[in-house]
């Protein structure tokens, strides 16, 4: 098992090499919106998992997840060759591509926060005109005054 720090360094290097190759060297149009977000290398340095996101061509267009996955699978051999040449390790790790779900989870969290803000605003509007259900001081007994003169309520 390799040093965890070495595995992290190798993962970062692999991520940089693959991202650069996708952007500048591989000419598949399905990879135009693909971004490598993270990489993890196994403890024995034989397997590398690369996480990616896909952006649409425009803000209104949905990303092509299937096309990007197929293009990454097709380019896996070329990318592994580039990783081997760029890292200089004895055994070039096998590459596995996994779609990153963090942006989807972040979008879902933003929706939940927006819903909570809207509920808070509705509650603030309802509270604005509301009055107490009973007397302003519900603990005061009508007509009973404090006879000992203390303000703390202690009768010693």
Curated annotation (Swiss-Prot):
Primary site of residence: cytoplasm
InterPro entries the UniProt entry points to: KH_dom-like_a/b, RbfA, RbfA_dom_sf, Ribosome-bd_factorA_CS
The protein's role, per its UniProt record: One of several proteins that assist in the late maturation steps of the functional core of the 30S ribosomal subunit. Associates with free 30S ribosomal subunits (but not with 30S subunits that are part of 70S ribosomes or polysomes). Required for efficient processing of 16S rRNA. May interact with the 5'-terminal helix region of 16S rRNA.
Chain residue ranges for the region called Disordered: 125-156
Compositional bias (Acidic residues): 145-156
HAMAP family: RbfA
Biased composition (Basic and acidic residues): 125-138
Biological source species: Mycolicibacterium smegmatis (strain ATCC 700084 / mc(2)155)
Annotated localization: Cytoplasm
One GO term describing the cellular component: cytosol
Assembly with partners or alone: Monomer. Binds 30S ribosomal subunits, but not 50S ribosomal subunits or 70S ribosomes.
Record key words, sorted: Cytoplasm, Ribosome biogenesis
Name of the protein: Ribosome-binding factor A
Keyword Cytoplasm: yes
Keyword Endoplasmic reticulum: no
A Pfam family per the record: RBFA
Phylogenetic lineage: Bacteria, Bacillati, Actinomycetota, Actinomycetes, Mycobacteriales
Gene Ontology MF term list: ribosomal small subunit binding
Family to which this protein belongs: Belongs to the RbfA family.
PROSITE patterns assigned: RBFA
GO biological process: maturation of SSU-rRNA
């Amino acid at each position: 098992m390799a040093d965890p720090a070495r595995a992290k360094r190798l993962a970062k290097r692999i991520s940089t090499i693959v991202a650069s190759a996708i952007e500048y060297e591989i000419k598949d149009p399905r990879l135009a919106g693909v971004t490598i977000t993270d990489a993890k290398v196994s403890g024995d340095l034989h397997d590398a998992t690369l996480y990616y996101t896909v952006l649409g061509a425009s803000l209104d267009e949905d990303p092509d997840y299937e096309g990007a996955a197929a293009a990454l699978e097709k380019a896996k051999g070329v990318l592994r060759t580039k990783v081997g040449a760029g890292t200089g390790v004895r055994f070039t790790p096998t590459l596995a591509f996994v779609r990153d779900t963090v942006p989807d989870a972040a979008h879902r969290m933003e929706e939940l926060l927006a819903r909570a803000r809207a509920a808070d605003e509705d509650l603030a509007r309802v509270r604005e005109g509301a009055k107490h259900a009973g007397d302003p001081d519900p603990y005061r007994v009508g007509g009973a005054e404090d006879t000992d003169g203390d303000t703390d309520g202690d009768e010693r």
